[in-house]
């Protein structure tokens, strides 16, 4: 039994190593996806820019980039998020 388990492990590892890497069928989009949102607003003065996550992500999100280059996910439906976006667009 131990021999067959070891043989199975070797076969699985060899298969994983030999499998061709699949490229993205659409593009080399490196935009991150968000799986959780920040619970409360960030200080507006800490935010320098923003971007939206890709439409390929399961959760729509706005990613705020702070002055220290931290990326923070926010819910685009929240009022404070929309206000921050408007403020960034005006500046």
UniProtKB/Swiss-Prot annotation:
Positions glycosylated per UniProt: 27-28
GO terms (BP aspect): antimicrobial humoral immune response mediated by antimicrobial peptide; calcium ion transport; cell surface receptor signaling pathway via STAT; cell-cell signaling; cellular response to fibroblast growth factor stimulus; cellular response to interleukin-1; cellular response to tumor necrosis factor; cellular response to type II interferon
Entry GO CC: cytoplasm; extracellular region; extracellular space
Disulfide bonds: 33-57, 34-73
Site features described as Cleavage, chain residue numbers: 25-26
InterPro entries linked to this entry: Chemokine_b/g/d, Chemokine_CC_CS, Chemokine_IL8-like_dom, Interleukin_8-like_sf
Pfam family, one: IL8
UniProt modified residues of type Methionine sulfoxide: 90
Domain of life: Eukaryota
UniProt keyword annotations, A-Z: Chemotaxis, Cytokine, Disulfide bond, Glycoprotein, Inflammatory response, Oxidation, Secreted, Signal
Induction summary: By mitogens.
Cell location: Secreted
Tissue expression as described in the entry: Expressed in the follicular fluid (at protein level). T-cell and macrophage specific.
GO MF, one example: CCR5 chemokine receptor binding
Signal sequence residues: 1-23
Gene3D superfamilies listed in its UniProt record: 2.40.50.40
PTM field: N-terminal processed form RANTES(3-68) is produced by proteolytic cleavage, probably by DPP4, after secretion from peripheral blood leukocytes and cultured sarcoma cells.
Effect of residue 24 to F: Antagonist of the chemokine receptors CCR1 and CCR3
Quaternary structure and partners: Homo and heterooligomers with other chemokines. Interacts with the brown dog tick evasin-4.
Protein purpose: Chemoattractant for blood monocytes, memory T-helper cells and eosinophils. Causes the release of histamine from basophils and activates eosinophils. May activate several chemokine receptors including CCR1, CCR3, CCR4 and CCR5. One of the major HIV-suppressive factors produced by CD8+ T-cells. Recombinant RANTES protein induces a dose-dependent inhibition of different strains of HIV-1, HIV-2, and simian immunodeficiency virus (SIV). The processed form RANTES(3-68) acts as a natural chemotaxis inhibitor and is a more potent inhibitor of HIV-1-infection.
Protein family (similarity comment): Belongs to the intercrine beta (chemokine CC) family.
Name used for this protein in its record: C-C motif chemokine 5
Gene: CCL5
């Amino acid at each position: 039994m131990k021999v067959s388990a070891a043989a199975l492990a070797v076969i699985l590892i060899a298969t994983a190593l030999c499998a061709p890497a699949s490229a993205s069928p659409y593009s080399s989009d490196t935009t991150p996806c968000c799986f959780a949102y920040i619970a409360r607003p960030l200080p507006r003065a800490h935010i320098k820019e923003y971007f939206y996550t890709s439409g390929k992500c399961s959760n729509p999100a706005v990613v705020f980039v702070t002055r220290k280059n931290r990326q923070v996910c926010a819910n685009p439906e929240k009022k404070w998020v929309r206000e921050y976006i408007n403020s960034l667009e005006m500046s």
